[in-house]
Regions:
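Intrinsically disordered, metal-sensing/regulatory segments
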Residues: 1-246
Length: 246
């Protein structure tokens, strides 16, 4: 098996860890706390990864003249995503109660799928060039894929009461890594360059930041402050551990 594809599959499997929480926590008194903690982990993790791991590391390698095009690109990205979210909020079933939780799970699935595809492309490409560097990159991905899987599985399961649906949504997001790797192997091997990768990463980081601030933050701000703090601290610890490892 292609080394890059192998590492991408391993990374994608860690996203499925969210299913463990979906299956094992059946006590209704703990449901709200589990959701709050998992969403808080996802919130801080998405912000830290998108800003420090993706955006800042990407633009520092760009020439100064590229900053204007990056700014314009970000504005366009934010506008499109913002309008998409506003349209979704107009849908009646997404307005109240469990509908909001389901909507959050769906949005997290879409966001993380879009995040995982370029991640799979990059992991596969790097690993096939430098396997040791590919291993480091994979360990970084694994650290943030775990809370990402939880942020999909828990909201979907507790809003629909369907384990099957929760599993399917997490699987969709997880397959993004593999899709990206296969896309890299089949189509992008000859045309992929640093500029294309940079703009893909910038696009992904802008999506992650907006989703974290527009969708996840409003969901957790009114919840139990202790649970929110625990989730944020866990997310920060995971991020720091990832930095130390790499």
């Amino acid at each position: 098996m292609n080394k890059g594809l192998y590492l991408s599959i391993i990374a994608s499997l860690t996203t499925l860890s969210g299913i463990f929480f979906m299956i094992n926590y059946k006590n209704k008194n703990k449901i709200d706390r589990i959701i709050t903690i998992s969403l808080s982990i996802a919130f801080i993790n998405m912000l830290l990864v998108s800003i420090f791991d993706i955006f800042l590391n990407t633009i520092k390698n760009m020439p100064n003249k590229a900053f204007l095009s990056v700014f314009i690109y970000l504005v366009i990205n934010y506008t499109i995503i913002y309008l998409f979210l506003k349209i979704c909020h107009k849908i009646k079933k997404f307005k109240v109660g469990e509908g909001k939780l389901y909507f959050l799970g769906v949005i997290n699935t879409i966001t993380l799928l879009l995040h995982n595809i370029p991640e799979g492309i990059i992991t596969c490409t790097v690993a096939n060039i430098n396997y040791k560097l590919g291993l480091k990159l994979t360990s970084s991905i694994i650290m943030h894929n775990i809370p990402e899987g939880i942020s999909i599985a828990v909201p979907i399961y507790y809003s629909t009461k369907s384990k099957k649906r929760g599993f399917i949504y997490v699987l969709i997001a997880a397959l993004g890594e593999v899709i990206g790797a296969l896309f890299s192997i089949i189509f992008l091997k000859s045309i992929l360059n640093q500029k294309i990768i940079d703009y893909m990463l910038i696009s992904v980081s802008s999506i992650m930041i907006l989703i974290a601030l527009e969708e996840i933050f409003p969901q957790i701000i009114s919840k139990n402050k202790k649970s929110v703090l625990i989730g944020i601290l866990i997310g920060i610890i995971l991020f720091i551990v990832n930095i130390v490892i790499n």
